[in-house]
Amino acid sequence: MAALVKQLGLADYASTYEAMQAFTKARTSETLDEIWVLEHPPVFTLGLAGDAGNLHSPSNQISLVQVDRGGEITYHGPGQIVVYLLLDLRRLGIFVKELVSRIEQAVIDTLADFGVQAERHPGAPGIYVSQQSRVPPEWVGAKIAALGLKVSKSCSYHGLALNVATDLEAFKRIHPCGYEGLKTVDMQTLGIKDNMDTISLRLLQHLQKQLIPS
């Protein structure tokens, strides 16, 4: 069964979060899976494992939203591709650990298409610039994509965020994923000049390859 892809543009975080919860609560075994592709206005989100103290420099212009996904604190804002994966894992025949691995692989494959070598870090969900990547040394090991999920009754929501041309200064206000000193980078800083639409399309293709049975 294919997934319905929705391009939502720039969407308020709180209302999108409520819509994800409502969709997941209302869905049945016959409900079509959906993939939402969007950007958010600036917002910090704090996951279930989060410590509000990891927002060490609060901003009056950027709100903090407590959410029910796994993980710690992160930032969303314009120039970041956010993909929410509303999937029936039972129907796909996978568990959450496998889902995480497949999402990570889709991001790694996408970045490779644009000349950035990236990798997983055990125990720290997300994608990081690898030593094999031809980038300035200060960006080796920097986080370029975040991942956080919630699974309810075998159905997932939340998803991933890939930094393309993001306000990296906002990340300096937090300890990303709870790690003090963790650098965050975007594709533009690494010299990738392709536009958001091109990168988004490629990411979507890799996600569908990994997650949607042919």
Curated annotation (Swiss-Prot):
Protein name: Octanoyltransferase
Family: Belongs to the LipB family.
Keywords: Acyltransferase, Cytoplasm, Transferase
Pathway(s) annotated for this protein in UniProt: Protein modification; protein lipoylation via endogenous pathway; protein N(6)-(lipoyl)lysine from octanoyl-[acyl-carrier-protein]: step 1/2
Subcellular location: Cytoplasm
Gene3D superfamilies linked: Bira Bifunctional Protein, Domain 2
Site (Lowers pKa of active site Cys): K143
EC number(s) recorded for this UniProt protein: 2.3.1.181
Taxonomic source organism: Polynucleobacter necessarius subsp. necessarius (strain STIR1)
Main location: cytoplasm
GO biological process: protein modification process
Residues that hold substrate according to the record: R69, G70, G71, E72, I73, T74, Y75, H76, A146, L147, G148, G159, L160, A161
Further comment found in the protein's record: In the reaction, the free carboxyl group of octanoic acid is attached via an amide linkage to the epsilon-amino group of a specific lysine residue of lipoyl domains of lipoate-dependent enzymes.
SUPFAM superfamilies: Class II aaRS and biotin synthetases (SSF55681)
Disulphide connectivity of cysteines: none
Catalytic activity: octanoyl-[ACP] + L-lysyl-[protein] = N(6)-octanoyl-L-lysyl-[protein] + holo-[ACP] + H(+)
Stretches assigned to the BPL/LPL catalytic domain: 29-214
Entries under CDD domains matching the protein: LipB (cd16444)
Reported function: Catalyzes the transfer of endogenously produced octanoic acid from octanoyl-acyl-carrier-protein onto the lipoyl domains of lipoate-dependent enzymes. Lipoyl-ACP can also act as a substrate although octanoyl-ACP is likely to be the physiological substrate.
GO molecular function, one term: lipoyl(octanoyl) transferase activity
Active-site annotation: C177
One GO location term (cellular component): cytoplasm
